[in-house]
Amino acid sequence: MKVKVYYNLHKKCYSIVSLEKENYGKVIKHENCVPLFDAQFKVSEKGRQRVLREQKKNVHAYVVGTLVSQDEPNFWLTEYFPIKVATYNPYKYSSFVDAHSKKPLAKASQVLLSKRHFVGRQTSQIYYVA
């Protein structure tokens, strides 16, 4: 199923929006962990400019891809493809970037959007395989 996923600032989890004909544009799930195949990283420049102008967060960045069951065997082929971390900060970048190299990202074969607790604090990470 083709979806777009964004971090929901109010619910503190990922919202999954259907891009399929029947439920197009509707939030179909909220999850702490979302695996995707054939993903594209998207940022609305108009939304980003609004963040910069108003200094207030809004939903304008998301990942589009094919939703995968979390039970999918061999989702991560780490033996052959190293897992990397993606990040996005509208005050620093106009696109998603690799967290280490800071190079812009447009797409990835596999993505895992994950929320976790670390020392009493919630963090979200975007892992990807190029």
Where are these regions (language model features)?
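Short intrinsically disordered terminal tails
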Residues: 1, 128-130
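Structural detector for short beta-strands of small beta-barrel domains
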Residues: 1-8
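A short, compositionally biased
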Residues: 8-15
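Acidic, low-complexity, intrinsically disordered interaction modules
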Residues: 15-121
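Short alpha-helical interface segments
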Residues: 124-125
